[in-house]
Amino acid sequence: IEKSLVGDLEGVTYHTISAGKLRRYFSLKNLTDPFKVVGGIFQAKRIINKVKPDVVFSKGGFVSVPVVIAAKGMAPIVAHESDYTPGLANKITARFADRVCVTFEDTLKYVGAKGVHTGTPIRPELYGGDRQRGLDFTGFSGEKPILLTMGGSQGAQAINDALRSALPRLTRSFDIIHLCGKGKKDDSIAEPGYVQYEYISKELPDLFAAADIILSRAGANAIFEFLALAKPALLIPLPLSASRGDQILNAGYFARKGYAMTLDQAGLTPDTLFDSIHDLYDRRLSFISAMSGDSTADGTDEVLDVIRSEAEGSIR
């Protein structure tokens, strides 16, 4: 998916390296993946030596680790942590980074003197969405409020199942756009007022513009896009059984700020989902008001300032 998203962008050269996944649990792959990381470091060193960047920017994830280790001493390193608490990859890369940008101000306590509160970068194309184009794409008239449901590129099966079970009741009040994830489309459903797509990229800004409320997981990048667009959301974070708990913390922060409602997956049923969606819609104006007063929703300029500062220091 990553290559399909960035491979054709003007001015972007896509490189691949070997990388081992960083796990907090026992797996036989833990015996082999360290060798992939070492191999990735040497591959990244060759690429960096050829490209000779003025600065290296890391957004986290296990693929970033060999790149950042390789870049140490070859170029300034700026890392960015999206979540409320640093993930394992960013805990490692922060040791090598010159600056660590954070999305949440509270995260500064985890990264020390290198930290700078910037917010998170928001894709500029999201601001160019058009409601009518979104309606035309989905075939909806716009007479009913629109619920946009998204669970990331891989989807969220628990949300998919609860939503589909509640469809007959929900579609009485809402038109529903469902981004269900790769391989999770159910062609047996022919419910008026319901459209489903495995994954959307180009048309996503228009779907955001058409949506009145959003149902989603609580990944930091996604929820800050909702904040930047002032879209009220019902957040169902990944449970601890399937994550390190970062989405639970992200969702809790948004709930405390009055930006979103949360529903634990353990309490997710068609009935609780139905009630929560209606509650979210009824309270949407208060959420919009709270979000509209946040000046840190889009951290693009702040992150760029840090990157430029480090790059200019390298050039000097």
List each model region and its residues.
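Acidic donor-binding loop of glycosyltransferase active sites
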Residues: 54-55, 197, 209-224, 231-232
